[in-house]
Swiss-Prot record:
Residues binding ATP, per UniProt: G3, P4, S5, G6, A7, G8, R9, S10
Family: Belongs to the RapZ-like family.
GO molecular function: ATP binding; GTP binding
Protein name in UniProt: Nucleotide-binding protein SPO0713
InterPro entries given in the database record: P-loop_NTPase (IPR027417), RapZ-like (IPR005337), RapZ-like_N (IPR053930), RapZ_C (IPR053931)
Amino acid sequence: MTGPSGAGRSTAINVLEDLGFEAIDNLPMGLLMRLLDGPALRRPLALGLDARNRDFSTEGFLDLSKRLASLEGFQVTTLYLDCSADILLRRFSETRRRHPMSPGSSPLEGVEHELELLRPIREAADTLIDTTALNVHQLRREVERWFAPSGGSMLAISVESFSYKRGLPRGLDMVFDCRFLANPHWQPDLRAADGRDPAVAAYVHADPQYLPFFTRVTDLLQSLLPAFRSEGKAHLSVGFGCTGGQHRSVALTEAVAKALAEAGGQVSIRHREMERRKPDARPD
C-alpha cells in the first residue's frame, strides 16, 4: 500500500490490522524480501510503503510488486490511496504540519512533486481508493469493502464475567447485572462448581426470569452489532456481573457468547474471577 502523504495510509493500515492482517507501516523496501524469508506467515500481511523513506523509488516499488507477484504461494494486491492536491493541502493546513516533501518550498510544490512521483504506481495499482471526499469512517468502510473476509467488517466481541465485589473490569462497553437471578451458591451440591458446569447452568436457566433476560440481551446485542460495524468499531466488550463472579455471571457469559458465535460473531470469553481464583476460594 502506498499513496501521497495525507491520503490516509495510516488509517488504512490500522483498519487492515483490525481485520486480522499483520500490519507493518513505513517498511523500507530493502527489508521486504528479508521479511518474507523469515518465519512462515500465519496471517495476511499488509505493508505500508512511504515515498519519504530514503530507499523508496517508483521504479523500485514497481519492480518489487512484480517480484512479489511472481512468488509461488502468494496472492499480492497493490493498493493505492489517492487524493486531490487541494484536499491534501487542506489536511496539512488543518493539522498544522509541514508537508514532508516541501522543505524550503511551498506546500503545493511538495504535494505536486509527490503526486507526480507516485503517478506510475497509481496507474499500475490493482486497487485504487480515492479519499478526496472520504472522512475517517468512510475510509474505514471502503477498506473493509475491499479487504474484509466475506466482504464484511470484522468486529471482535469479548464477553466477560466478573464479581461486583471486586469492581467492574476496565474497558467494558456494556454491563449487565445478573444478581437478580437465583444464586446456586445457596445449593450445597452446586456451591463448589462454577457456571460452566451443566448442573449450575441448568439451575440458572431454570429461573423464570432467566429466559426473558437472556432473550432481550441477545436480541439487543445482535441488533446493535451492524451499527457498531458500520461505525468502524473493531472491538466490543460486554460484561456480566454477579456477587462472586463464579456462578450466574459465568453461566450468562457462556450462553450469550455461544449465541453470538452461532450468529456469526468473532467471540472470545473471559472469566475474570476464575482466573484469579485460588484453590480455597469460595464461589458465590
